[in-house]
């Protein structure tokens, strides 16, 4: 009976902490939207290309995260402050691009007064989440 109670308490604790983590991530991503446009297998086994449209409200923040592969992004509209670990922060505007190597922690903020729109292409490991929050 003690084991059943212990398992129940552990399960409830894990569920509560998991829910708090999801709420925290959602709050961090307020004003951020990623819409998948295309996904396709590559000629390299276990890899796929994913193309997404990203929209970030004025003053919106993309929390620090990683990808299981490379990211190449073109800024269609707006201005962003991009922070990529190991590099100086960059402020980029429409018409500019940035690249993030696989597994490198990065994030950003819309520093403009209008929504920012981006086109991002990811070359990632198939079957893994496209983005994982940084720890």
Where are the language model's segments positioned?
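A short beta-loop-beta micro-motif enriched in histidine and acidic residues
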Residues: 46-47, 60-74
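Glycine- and acidic-residue-biased ligand/ion/polar-headgroup-sensing regions
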Residues: 67-86, 96
């Amino acid at each position: 009976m003690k084991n059943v109670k212990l398992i129940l308490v552990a399960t409830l604790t894990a569920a509560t902490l998991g829910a708090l983590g999801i709420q925290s991530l959602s709050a961090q991503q307020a004003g951020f939207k990623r819409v998948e446009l295309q996904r396709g297998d590559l000629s390299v086994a276990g890899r796929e290309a994913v193309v997404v449209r990203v929209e970030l409200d004025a003053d919106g923040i993309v929390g620090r995260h990683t990808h299981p592969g490379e990211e190449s992004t073109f800024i269609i509209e707006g201005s962003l402050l991009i922070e990529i670990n190991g590099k100086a922060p960059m402020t980029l505007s429409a018409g500019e691009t940035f690249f993030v190597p696989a597994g490198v922690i990065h994030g950003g903020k819309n520093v403009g007064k209008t929504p920012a729109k981006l086109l991002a292409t990811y070359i990632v490991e198939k079957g893994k989440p496209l983005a994982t929050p940084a720890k």
